[in-house]
């Protein structure tokens, strides 16, 4: 799936992510559709570094910097610098996941 296809799937009507989408990408899909709880559940279930990265992003989004920092560390990443928007980070993660 390309990044463009991923974005098109978000804009569509289905209540469930596209077939074949897994783990952290499912979490980002739910987040983009406004379902933080489903996104968090999917990220938490994905024990990979990618899952930890999305998990970190979600806690950053909710304003829990301490918890986000923990998950960024598990993902082997640093918390984004001040000024990096949530939208920019979401796109960075999505591009990394759907092109992987």
Where are each of the predicted segments found?
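N-terminal alpha-helical interaction modules that lie
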Residues: 1-49, 59-62, 66-69, 73-100
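Alpha-solenoid helical repeat scaffolds
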Residues: 53-54
